[in-house]
Amino acid sequence: VLLSGCGTGVISTVGEMRDTGDPKYVALTFDDGPSPRCTPRLLDGLRELGAKATFFVVGCQVVKDPDIVQRIAAEGHQVGNHSYDHADLHSLTSAQALADLEKNDALLRELLGDGDYWVRPPYGLMTEAEAAALSVPLVNWSVDTEDWRTKDSGKILDVIYRCTGDGDIVLLHDRYQNTVDAVLMAIEHLQQQGYVFVTVAELLEIKGIAPQAGETYRRA
C-alpha cells in the first residue's frame, strides 16, 4: 500500500524533536532524478552541510545526464534503482516489471560499476513474488512529504518537522526547486537538534539491521 503523509511509523512532534544529546539518524531519499536544474544544486547544498542522501534514479533520466549520477556516487551518496521508465509495475506483467528494473540496473552497473543498487519501485508498488525475485533489498518510506503534489516549500518543511524522527526514511523528489529549498533549510535546522543525515544503507547498519534481498524497508 502506498504510504502518505507521516506514514505508519512513529510520528515525532516538533516538541519531541528537541535535542536529547543523542544523535538521531534520518535517511533522506530522492526519486525520479536526476534533474539537470535541481540535482546539482541539491548536491552542492548537501556537500556544504555535510549530509548524505539516497537517490533512486530513473534510467530514462540517467541516460540524459549520466555525469550527475556519477557525481552523486562520487560524493558518497547512495544510488538506487527506481526503474528505467517509471511505469506503474502493477500495470505490467511480472516479467515486464522485472525486465524494466533489470534494464536500469544494467545501466547503473555500466555507468558506476558493479554494486548493489537497491530498488524503490515506482509508487512503492510491487508484488511479493516480484520482490522475492530481486537480489537486492527494496526501500519504501515512513514519511511522505508529498512534495510532488504541493510544490510548496512551507508545506514540505511542515511535514518534515512534524513527522520526522530517529530512524525515519523520508520520501522526496529532486525535480523541484521548492523541494531543494525546503530540504536544505530542514537539514540545517535539524542538525542543530542532533540529527545526522545518512544513506539508507548507513541507516540500517547504524540501527543494527542486516538488509535482506527481496525484503522491503520503510524505516529503521
Q: Where do the PLM segments sit?
A:
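Active-site beta->alpha N-cap acidic-glycine motif
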Residues: 7-110, 114-116, 189, 196, ...
